[in-house]
From Swiss-Prot:
Function: Catalyzes the attachment of L-aspartate to tRNA(Asp) in a two-step reaction: L-aspartate is first activated by ATP to form Asp-AMP and then transferred to the acceptor end of tRNA(Asp).
Name the record gives this protein: Aspartate--tRNA ligase
Disordered: region residues: 587-614
Highest taxon of the lineage: Bacteria
Listed GO CC annotations: cytoplasm
Residues noted as binding L-aspartate in the record, renumbered to the chain: E174, R220, H448, R489
Family listed: Belongs to the class-II aminoacyl-tRNA synthetase family. Type 1 subfamily.
Sequence positions that bind ATP: R220, D221, E222, Q229, E482, G534, L535, D536, R537
Source species of the chain: Lactobacillus johnsonii (strain CNCM I-12250 / La1 / NCC 533)
Organism lineage: Bacteria, Bacillati, Bacillota, Bacilli, Lactobacillales
EC category: ligase
Length: 614
């Protein structure tokens, strides 16, 4: 094959008058009788190829025989187009073909290769190699590649060492479920795929590699949603002899380079810092969207003595009353639309939603009759009311109130269009609690992980009241999504033991699971700290996508399966016997059903499409 001159999408006026060799896919063919136009597509874009009667009868026949998605080689001369297409990068020129070689024909694809398609997601994933030909996905995958390039360049410039950590490790029952890999050599024992390289990278600090980074593949067996996949990539870093500021400086430098190299945006540093308490009380979230205001306001002082028992009763029971004001919401939201929000926040355990409108100097709505003149003046002052606002209020336990208003705030912001487009707003959330209470588990868990260093006061509290301790941890948030998180790590055995004890570990369990770590901490372990950024989520947001699948070449669907290769799938009985696994009877019918379905699909495919002559 002859060497390609350039990508089809890069053939601009600078090539005018030159002979070129191009390769790509046929996007579209238009036969006008004496002229045939071919849109030739590759990863960089589309260029128009023209074949006319002067090109010869054979070339005209080849051009006329082409179908969409045929793979071709084109040779020809770059000439000016008679009519410029300003919508195309290549719109000033076209290629006057002298030779076309059909490298492979294509059957009619199950969906058209273009950005706007109506194909079902399952179909797109089954034919993912076709889906990935669409320009929007190619741009997203290329953007992800540019992020990776920037990461490698930055850490190399800063003297970090790229070290791979094991994929096959030991299972830990903490956190999400592990993906388990059975051992053939040790029947009944299992490896676990890593949920993160956390302990390995800490051990590397103990080994003296004071600046580590890795693009780490991680695995979590958890329920999926738009911003999660069972396998994902972390931009992982760890350093020795640095405090929080040092790690944050490196992180800001990395983000600055990514934003410049990938988005051509100059990120302003230092990035703003707010405490966890401020984030929760002002935004209702530890992942605050700081692109817009609509802050939460504490109305407890206004209503603590109110005759409206929904408010004063909640406060008396140790709860709070908070609210947000939606500008112009008085006209935009009818009673019916507001009541729909009541059902929405019940999922966050809120008992109800109180609301009032402020128009023409008057309050109206269900709770207006309970407002004293003093209440009204206080609300006007608290929210700086100008007129036209809708005020929504939740009274309940602090966590219920903040969760409910956080989600209402986000929903109102989207509905009223106050979120600025094309803005990437970063913020550090610092000074986290060391522990948080998990209602589902009914116990305290680590807010980040069990290896996070408490602050100085928190170290003392580990012995007396650990759940009041604060952590030396920090999250980097962008546009209301957590991009990454990190912390100062525990580097002394005594503190690590206290941490495990506070989490409810017995000494036996702690040493069975993490004895190697505690032994290491006694061997001259340095102070160390680190951070991990979710590459997939960062790429998704920079690409303007709503789902991580759009920045992942071969993702799983919402059921954690992969329709193209049919993974996961049953395996041969002998393979199971080799690793000492037997499928329980209750699952045998399901496995057999899956095997039969896959066999049938394979046979139908072979019967319909195969050229194999047995």
């Amino acid at each position: 094959m002859d060497k390609r001159t350039d990508y089809a999408g890069n053939i601009t006026s600078k090539y005018e008058g030159q002979e070129v060799t191009l390769y790509g896919w046929v996007q579209r063919v238009r036969n006008l009788g004496n002229l045939v136009f071919i849109d030739l597509r590759d990863r960089e874009g589309i260029v128009q190829v023209v074949v006319n009667k002067d090109s010869g009868e054979k070339l005209m026949e080849i051009a006329d025989s082409l179908n969409n998605e045929d793979v071709i080689e084109v040779k020809g001369k770059v000439v000016k187009r008679s009519s410029v297409n300003p919508e195309m990068k290549t719109g000033e020129v076209e290629v006057d073909a002298t030779e076309i070689d059909v490298l492979n024909k294509s059957k009619v694809p199950p969906f058209e290769i273009k950005d706007d398609i109506n194909a079902a997601e399952q179909t797109r994933l089954k034919y993912r190699y076709l889906d990935l030909r669409r320009p929007t996905l190619q741009r997203a995958i290329i953007l992800r590649s540019k992020i990776l390039k920037a990461v490698h360049e930055y850490f190399d410039e800063q003297g970090f060492i790229d070290i791979e950590t094991p994929i096959l490790g030991k299972s830990s029952p903490e956190g999400a479920r592990d993906y388990l890999v059975p051992s053939r050599i040790y029947p009944g024992s299992f490896y676990a795929l890593p949920q993160s390289p956390q302990l390995f990278k800490q051990l590397l600090m103990g080994a003296g590699f004071d600046k580590y980074y890795q693009l780490a593949r991680c695995f979590r067996d958890e329920d999926l949603r738009g911003d999660r996949q069972p396998e994902f990539t972390q931009i992982d870093m760890e350093t020795s002899f640095l405090d929080e500021q040092g790690v944050q400086d490196y992180t800001e430098g990395l983000l600055k380079k990514i934003m410049k190299d990938v988005m051509n945006i100059d990120l302003k540093t230092p990035i703003k810092r707010i405490t966890w308490d401020e984030a929760m009380n002002k935004y209702g979230s530890d992942k605050p969207d700081t692109r817009y205001e609509m802050y939460l306001h504490d109305l407890s002082p206004i209503f603590k003595d109110s005759d409206f028992k929904v408010f004063s009763g909640a406060i008396a029971d140790g709860g709070v009353v908070k609210g947000i004001a939606v500008k112009n919401g008085a006209k935009e939201y009818s009673r019916k639309k507001i009541e729909e929000k009541q059902d929405y926040i019940k999922r966050y355990n809120a008992k109800g939603l109180a609301w009032v409108k402020y128009e023409d100097g008057e309050f109206s709505g269900p709770i207006a009759r309970f407002l004293t003149d003093e209440n009204k003046e206080a609300l006007k002052k608290e929210f700086d009311l100008e007129g036209g606002e809708l005020i929504v209020i939740v009274a309940d336990k602090w966590k219920v109130v903040t969760d409910s208003l956080d989600h209402l705030r986000r929903e109102f912001a989207h509905e009223t269009g106050i979120i600025p487009e094309g803005v990437f707003d970063f913020v550090w959330v610092v000074d986290w609690p060391l522990f948080e209470y998990d209602e589902g588990l009914g116990r305290w868990i680590a807010a980040h992980h069990p290896f996070t260093m408490p602050d100085d006061e928190g170290i003392k509290l580990l012995d007396t009241d650990p759940h009041k301790a604060h952590a030396r941890s920090y999250d980097i948030v962008m546009n209301g999504d957590e991009m990454g998180g990190g912390s100062i790590r525990i580097h002394k055995r005594s503190i690590q033991e206290k941490m495990f004890k506070a989490l409810g570990f017995t000494k036996k369990r702690a040493y069975e699971q993490f004895g190697y770590l505690m032994d290491a901490l006694d061997m001259g372990f340095p102070p160390h700290a680190g951070l991990a950024i979710g590459l997939d989520r960062l790429a998704m947001m920079l690409a303007g996508k709503d789902n991580i699948r759009d920045v992942t070449a071969f993702p799983k669907n919402a059921s954690a399966s992969e329709p193209m290769m049919h993974a996961p799938a049953p395996v041969a009985d002998q393979q199971l016997a080799d690793i000492g696994i037997e499928v329980e009877k209750q699952y045998e019918d399901s496995v057999k059903e899956t095997e039969q379905r896959l066999e049938k699909e394979a046979q139908e495919d072979a019967d319909k499409n195969s050229t194999w002559d047995e």
